Amino acid sequence: MKKIGILGTGVVGTTIGTKLIGLDYEVMIGSRTASNEKSLSWVDKNGSSASAGTFEEAADFGEIIFNCTRGDAALEIFKQAGLNKFDNKTVIDISNPLDFSKGMPPTLIPEYVNTNSLAEEIQKLLPEANVVKTLNIVNCRGRRS
């Protein structure tokens, strides 16, 4: 069974994690602390194929890593996890380079638009990983009839 590590405990990370468990993957969701309430609640709802840990533990665990963190924190989170943890792994980046510092609505982080992207910066930070940028404008809540 493939092991997936997810960085981020928000609605995007937990929704993707739940779907992957339904497809028979083992999933560890990572946050700053292993005792994060959101991640522990998610584990309780998803059974034995779900686990929670730190960013570092999720990066260690996963053969494939999903980055579901806020774009303004993504690079720092990869550093917290340990850059070498991503060597020879596929990193699926779903983050958006949004700045929430002035409240809602957020704005784009200027250095990651026009001539550069957050995914390119992640790839530079993780030269031994295969970074794939996708799903960043797909609503994770699904369609409603």
Predicted segment positions?
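NAD(P)+-binding Rossmann beta1-loop-alpha1 motif at the extreme N-terminus of oxidoreductases
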Residues: 1-48
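Fold-independent oxyanion-binding glycine-rich loops
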Residues: 9, 31-32, 69, 94-95, ...
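Short amphipathic alpha-helical segments
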Residues: 17-19, 40-41, 77-81, 103-105, ...
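Short, well-ordered alpha-helix to beta-strand connector turns
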Residues: 24, 61-63, 129
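A short helix-to-beta-strand connector/capping loop
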Residues: 45-51, 127-130
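Rossmann-like NAD(P)-binding element
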Residues: 47-92, 96-104
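Rossmann-fold NAD(P)-binding glycine/threonine-rich loop
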Residues: 94-141
